Structures are given as structure tokens and as C-alpha cells.
Amino acid sequence: SAASDVYKRQLLDRMAELKMNVFHWHLTDDQGWRIEIKKYPKLTEVGAFRDSSEINHFHSNVFDGKPHGGFYTQDDIKEVVDYAAKRHIMIVPEIEMPGHASAAIASYPWLGTTGKQIKVPCNFGVHYNAYNVADPRVIQFQEDVLEEVIALFPSPVIHIGGDELRYNAWKESPMVRNYMKQNKITSPGGLQVFFTNNISNFLASKNRHMMGWNEITGAQVNDYQRDGSGASQQQLAPGTIVHFWKGEPELIKETIEKGYDIVNSYHIYTYLDYDYESIPLQKSYEFNPIPEGLTEAQQSKVFGIGCQMWGEFIPTVESMNKKIYPRLAAYAEV
């Protein structure tokens, strides 16, 4: 919308004033697909719209009853990328995979593990739907989508999400279980790393680096992923940028020791949608993204900090601004 465009430009202007140089743009999720992909028009015809939105808080099961939707055309995206570039800001796009896939599966049911038609969810939080990574058509879909994304964003880094994958969809799929057996993969966490590495290889063939939330390492940082199947035996592809958001800070050190670069977005310090009681201004300002106990060479593997504004329960631009400012200025100083 015009209002959304104005707001994005205002945010990019503020970032430029604060000399912040990367804008991470989360473009797909369970509750909506927000970027036009010309090869798959239903992603925005179907996936960009939901019937209602959960309000108040997670798991409230209270809904506003108002249809919600919208997306950015490729021309819209080009304009924003250009506007940011003129202010020395690189935009890193995020296309979620293999979880947070409900909007895509609602658009094309064959992308999921059951093939059943679902609706774009109206409630927020983590959903059970995941891409059927055992189906070559689904891998082709991911590559087709990324091909169009790469053409729009000059960023050398492409973010593939990878967070909060519930393993149930894979465990309950005979096709996925057979695929794991064929590839000698012993756990769903290992399958996620295997899938992620295939996407990394594709991006590398296009001269792009992959970035993803820290579950892409196979770390089971969410309670619902600790299913007794054990840690992943698969090794994440070298050159991947790991976006740390959850888990014990020791995971950062372990990840760096394995040779990966890090962006630190530890949620208890950096989530802008958290209220000021959880993250007061002083806490924002004092956050050190480099954990203790690293050598000088290891410290250089921490690229910086990311601060996230998740919009589930942010109904207006005014309420968003109250949460972003002045904390954004504090993060710019970190």
C-alpha cells in the first residue's frame, strides 16, 4: 500500500541517519506470502491473503474478523532496493524454508507432505506444515523462487529462514522417511541440514552466500525439536552465515569454532516487538554481540547485530514506531 511504502522509506531514512547499512526483509511466512513470483502466481493470488488475524497475544484464539492481505510486486521491490541503495543500505531478502511454509502450501498443496488443501492460517506462532523436501518438484520450486529473488536483490547474501521447523510433517510422511533412508539420514535435524546444504549449493552456483537462523546448523534449540532422534550428523555447508537468535550463547562460540560467520540477534536483547520492560533502552545499548572467550580472529567472525521487528501484534505504524524508537538508535551504537 502507499502507506506501507511511505513507512518503509521513513525507516530506511532513519537507518541511513544512524549509519545502519543492512535491512533484513522477511518476505514470506505461514500467515502470508508477500513477494510476487511470476512463475507461481498463486503465491500472491492465494498466499498473500487470510480471512482474519489473531489479536491480543499468541494462542489467544481471539480474531479480529477482518480479511488481511497484500504483497509487493517485483516493480515495488526494485523501487525499495533502489531507494535503499541510494542510502548505502543493502537489503537482504528472506524466503522461509523448509518451515513457516503454510501460505505457500495453501497456494500449491503439492508443496506440502500430505498434498491436502489448507487455508492460510489466521493464528500466529509455529505451524506444522513443512515443505516436502523429498519431492524433486519442491526443490525445483525453491530454486525457481530463489532465481527470481536473486534477480531482484543485488545482495551477495540470501536468507533462507530455517527457524522453528516442527518435525511432525516429515516424520508422518512415508515419502520423506524413505528419502531419509535412501540418503542415510538418521534424524529430521539432519534432513534439515541436508536440504539446507542443497539450497546453499544452488545459491553458491549463482555467486550468493546463504544465511539462515541458527536451527540450520542442526541445533535443536526449540523444545518441540528435542524428540530423542539425536543431534544432526550432517555438517552445514562452509561459507554459511548463521543468524543466531535462540539457544545458549555457547552455541555462538561453537558455531564460530566450526568456521562459520555469525550475525547475533539473540532474542532476549534484540527483538523490537518485545516491550520496554523486557528490553529497556539501557539493555539494548549495553548488548555485546561478541561473546566472551573468543580469540581476536574468532571475534572477526561476528559480522554484527540484527534487531528484528516482528509484526504479529503490532496493529499500527504508531505502535511500531514506539517500539522501534529510540531502541534502534541504541542498537546502531552497539
What residue spans do the PLM features occupy?
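Short, small-residue-biased leader/transition segments that mark boundaries at the very start
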Residues: 2-7
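Catalytic domains of carbohydrate-active enzymes, especially glycoside hydrolases
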Residues: 9-30
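Conserved, mostly hydrophobic/aromatic
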Residues: 15, 91, 160, 203, ...
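Short, well-ordered coil/turn segments that N-cap beta-strands
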Residues: 19-21, 85-89, 154-158, 206-208, ...
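Active-site-proximal loop/turn and secondary-structure-junction residues that shape catalytic pockets
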Residues: 27-31, 39, 95-101, 164-166, ...
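Aromatic- and acidic-residue-enriched carbohydrate-binding clefts of CAZyme catalytic domains
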Residues: 31-86, 101-140, 168-188, 193
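Active-site neighborhood of glycoside hydrolase catalytic domains
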Residues: 104, 109, 119-239, 245-248, ...
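Flexible, acidic glycine-rich loops studded with aromatic residues
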Residues: 210-334
